[in-house]
Every structure is written in C-alpha cells, then in structure tokens.
Amino acid sequence: MSTQIKREKPIKKQFQKKKFADLAVQGTNNSSIASKRSVELTYLPKLGVGSNAEKLQPGKPYFRYFVPKKIKRSPCINRGYWLRLHAVRSHIESILDSCQENITIINLGCGYDPLPFEMLDPQNPQYSRYSNRLNFIDIDYPDLLNIKSGVIKETPELLSIIGGIDPTETNMIISERYKTIPCDLYDMPAFEALLKSENLGHPNTIKIFIAEVSLAYMKHEKADDIIASCSKFPNSHFIMLEQIIPVGEYEPFSGRMLKHFSKNESPLQTVTKYQTIESQIERFRRYNFTNVNAGDMFQLWNSLSSNVHSKIENIEPFDELEEFHLFCHHYMICHATNNEQFKFNESIKFREPEVLPSLPISGLRIDSIDKIGFSKRFGSSVISKDSIIYTGGASPYRSDEADVINLEECTIETLSNMKLPDARVCHSYDSLMDGKLDILIGGRKAPHQPFNDVFIFEKQTASWEKVATLDYPIYRHATSSLSNDKLLLFGGNFCLKEPFLTITVKSETQIVVRSINCPDSIKSSIGAAMCYNEASNDVIILGGSSNGTEVSDKLIIMSYDDKSETLTVKKEVTNDLFKRYGSKIIHLTDDEYLVVGGTSPDRLFDASNSIITYNSRSDEIKSVRIPDHIWQGDELMLVGFELQKLNGKIIIFGGGATCYGFGSVNNSIYSIEK
C-alpha cells in the first residue's frame, strides 16, 4: 500500500464523519420547522408574534409552504415555539422601529425559516411598512438550501413576494431583495468571502445577523469566529437564540437536553463553554459586540402584557407550568450590537439575573432508597400503617389505580378493590377518622376537564361513595388534616373569593363544606404548598400562582381558630427561595419547616437550594444539600412528587417531568433524616 493511500484513508474517514454530523444538524431543522408549523396552526390564527402579539392580532401563515402537512404538538411545545418565534421577530422589529436606514438581515443556519417572505410580503400588514428597505440573505448547508430553493421556485405565492429571480442560478435564489447562499459555516475563509462579496461594509446599512440555535452545534471556537467576523461590519446587530445550562449539566432537564442532542448525533457544543447568560454576555463583548441585552425566555415571557398572557391561556388548555419554567430557563435570547448608541426597547430590556447568597448547611441528609420502579407523577398519597397508598397520577397516561408502596420490602402492589371513580391527576387524597376512611377531592383529566367531586373510600367495605359536588372544580389545591374528622383545603381555582374551605366528615356518607374567614390579602392559588402544625396550631402556605404566570415569593404563617373557623396572619416572610410552584412543605419541629422542590419563574433550583429548611423563630434558611452521587447520577426532578413522614423519616417519592421534546425523567425514592 502506498503512502498516498495511507494518508487518504483517514482523510476520507474524517470527511465521512463530518458529512454525517452535518446531516444530523440539518435534521434538527426538520423537527424545529414542524413544531413551528404546529404553532402556525394552533396559535397564529388567533395571536401573531412580534408587534401583532401586543395588538392581539393574528399572524399570516408562511410555514405551510415548507411543511404542508398539519402537525399537532403538545401544549408546552406549542407555547415554547410560539415564544421562540416571538423572541426573534420582536427583537428584529425593535431594530426596524429604531431607524430609517436600509437593513440587511443575514440568517445563519436559516433552515426552512420563511422569515424573509413574512417581512417582504406587501400583503402582510405587520411588516409592509418596512419591506422597501429590507434585504435578506439566507445561509445554510448546500443540500438544505437546494430543497428550500426548490420549494420557492415551485410556489407562485412565494415567487410573487420576492419578484423575478435570476434564471441562470440553478443552486441559489437571487432576486432583488432575497438571496439564498450555500455555505458551510465551519469554512471560515468561505464565510468571510461571502460576507465581503455582499458589500456589508457600508456604515449606513444596518446589518442584522440571526442565529436561532444554529451556532450551538459548532465547536465554540468556530462559533466564536463567526461572531467575531460579523462584528467587523459597522452598525451590526446579532440576535442569538441558544440553549444554556444555568446550574450545570447535572440539573435533570439540562442533562436530558444534552443527552437528547448527543443521541441524535447533533451534540450541543457551545453550551458547555457558555453555560449561563452572564457568560454569553461576556462572550459577545469579547468579540466586539459591546452593547448587549440578554435574558432567558421566561424573562421574555414576563415582558408580555397580561392581555397577551390571557389570550394565550385561552388558545389551548394548559397545565404544564413547571415544564414551561424549565424550558424557558434553558433558552436565552441575546441581542448584541457594536453600535454603542443603540437603545434597547424598554419592554424587552432584561435585568441581569440576581445571584442568591450561599446558604448554611442543615443537619439533614438525603439518601436514596432501593429503586423499586415507581414512576408515577402528580398523584396523591396517604400513610397506611407502615406503607404508602398512592392514588391516581400519570405514567405517562392518567391512572385510576391505587398502589401500595412498601419500603421495607421494596414492593409495589396495585389494589384491585380500590380503583378510583375516574382516572385523575392533581387531586388530593387524605386519611381521616383514625384511618378508617379516606377522602378524595377534585383533580382533573385533561386541563380543560377538572373535577368538582368529593368521594369517601370506606375501608371496611372497600367502597367509594360520592358525598359532595363542590360549586366549582378544583385541582392543584393543597390539603392538611386539622383534626381527626376535619380537613383544610386551600386554592385549586383562580376565581375563588374565599380561598380556604374546611371539610368535616360526619359519617361515611356525609360531609359538611364551609368557607372560612381569612385576610383579604390571601388570594386563591394553584400549585401552592401548605401544612398544618398541630402543636402550634399554625397553618403555613408557600408559593403558588394566583393567575397562571406570577408565582408568590411569600411564606405565610397563620393561626387557626377552630371555634370561629378563622385564619389570622401571624407572620409573612418574603424570599426568592419561597417563589415556588408545585413545591411541598412539612413541619419538622414547632419552629422548623422543610420545603422541597417546585419550580420558579426566576431561576433553576440546584443541588443546594432545591430543598431547604426554614426556621420561623430565627427566619434562617438552610440548605438540605443533595449529595453529588444523587444530583449527578439520579436525575432527581422535584416536580409532581409526593412528600410523607414515615417511621421517623421524610420520604420523597413519585414525580418527574417531561423535558419538553427531549424525553422524560422519573424519580427514584429518597429519604431525608438527621
């Protein structure tokens, strides 16, 4: 074998490997564009993006030309991709509205994005006032642009928008205001030559470079070279939407996201270098985009008006706020420019994330219990002797089963005589009358199918009895036993004028439901945590949302008077670590409380603050640190879980989440003790 052939083999292998990786990255475009098509079908007929969103106006459909098939994604994916569309388009509009100059928009890794046709279409009232000063350059892999160009050439509606095209170009589209230019972004000399050939150096022409999850698949050095090259042109803006991992690769959603892209042979390479918003801001400043505004996607969500939020809530039923929090904290939108005089639109000018102080460590420790394959979430449970009875929940489909979990024997048994009246999630299930009967309240099927029923399960006869129908449906409410025959219920519906109820059991077939007095400042919430401390006669509530977007950052301690059935606020404490949706709270001593899990609109929780203790006497908050072998190895996702005291230990079981389109995480079982 000659030396020449020996050299050619590794070169050929390297070329084939790169070609395969390029195809995998191109494949991500197919998934993304299909999800945007779902948004176009579900959202845009009722609510557009960019300026149309705040005007509550619909958007015109353009994705249909590239994805004619009707596609339906989950509500959380739809909401996430609507927000992605809004992120890029609202930031472009903020630049367009700030100037009168001609603008060239260069889409790096454009895929099948129809953005040029949206903005150049004279029949699109959202952008028609800009169209005579806009030019577009779509850049992507040659194979992908060949397909896109073919669709454009075969679609009269698209051709009519961009006008006549150069018939001599077979692999490109060249028209007066729109071009497709194939380029491998890894080939820096070719990329720089491309930019130079487009005469982008004129200072009176504004350049907008867009990278919507396109540079993320490149080695960070190569992606940095792209950013640096773009910054050399005067009056340039760079809009980037990209993944981040704010608390590191071991956070469960982060880990699942990274594994998903690696499994699909399109690993996220820049995110391991630029994990946080702060590092992304520093990145752009280092490469001469010195004027930078960046935030995560929930900050963008919060910039929308309450009218837009209400409109979105009415588009499709939605009860996936935890998943939406997690998704939004893993994507950032960054607008950077080398124009120091540019003023960012105040409505989308993000504040830099607040850094929380480190916490002292509590004396509690977390251990994992032998895995016994329990994978349900959003159910409800009671303690029965030395076992746990878990009802309903989903895995992934809603269940009507009751399971007995025996931790000593590491067994799970489904009780055939205890099947629930209906499959449900987000209900409450409590034991009263010395364990002789259990009470099931509310919950839901789908988000638009909530329950308002109350059932009692009489253990001696193993039968369910419907004992009441509430005036309104409730789910994601919180309950605590006040006495042997009385239950306190909080929230479960945004519209309640009286957020607390007591439910008193009179017999196996009769209950009395009463609203109780509480201060007007206490609003009904869903997803709040509550516990009752019998020794101090205190009711504690924490977090929750009263409107589906905002989450309370308060822990409120109230004294309960049984005779007058009145709650009186004793203490109200505000802290960012109390801003949780879907958390649980349990009292450890008269003064100390354990707060576990949930999600926040402001941040991702990590190994040091996912679980905390609060002392009501000293107001001290301590960390119940999740040990490395659990945090790094188990994907502990404190969403949709249950929390119970059993044999002197606190038990965390059930729970997990669907991590957007990246797969699901299910928890093992854990104990907390001194």
From Swiss-Prot:
Reactions it catalyzes: 7-[(3S)-3-amino-3-carboxypropyl]wyosine(37) in tRNA(Phe) + S-adenosyl-L-methionine = 7-[(3S)-(3-amino-3-methoxycarbonyl)propyl]wyosine(37) in tRNA(Phe) + S-adenosyl-L-homocysteine; 7-[(3S)-(3-amino-3-methoxycarbonyl)propyl]wyosine(37) in tRNA(Phe) + S-adenosyl-L-methionine + CO2 = wybutosine(37) in tRNA(Phe) + S-adenosyl-L-homocysteine + 2 H(+)
Q: What pathway does this protein act in? A: tRNA modification; wybutosine-tRNA(Phe) biosynthesis
Query: What processes does the entry annotate via GO biological process terms?
Result: tRNA methylation; wybutosine biosynthetic process
Its keywords, alphabetically, are: Methyltransferase, S-adenosyl-L-methionine, Transferase, tRNA processing
Primary enzyme class:
transferase
**Which residues are noted in the entry as S-adenosyl-L-methionine-binding?**
84, 109, 140, 184-185, 212
Name the Enzyme Commission number(s) assigned to this protein.
Answer: 2.1.1.290, 2.3.1.231
Q: Which Pfam families match?
A: Kelch_4, LCM
**SUPFAM superfamilies from the UniProt entry:** Galactose oxidase, central domain, S-adenosyl-L-methionine-dependent methyltransferases
Gene Ontology MF: a single term: tRNA methyltransferase activity
Q: Function, please?
A: Probable S-adenosyl-L-methionine-dependent methyltransferase that acts as a component of the wybutosine biosynthesis pathway. Wybutosine is a hyper modified guanosine with a tricyclic base found at the 3'-position adjacent to the anticodon of eukaryotic phenylalanine tRNA. May methylate the carboxyl group of leucine residues to form alpha-leucine ester residues.
Give the family per the record. Belongs to the methyltransferase superfamily. LCMT family.
According to UniProt, the name of this protein is tRNA wybutosine-synthesizing protein 4
Source lineage: Eukaryota, Fungi, Dikarya, Ascomycota, Saccharomycotina
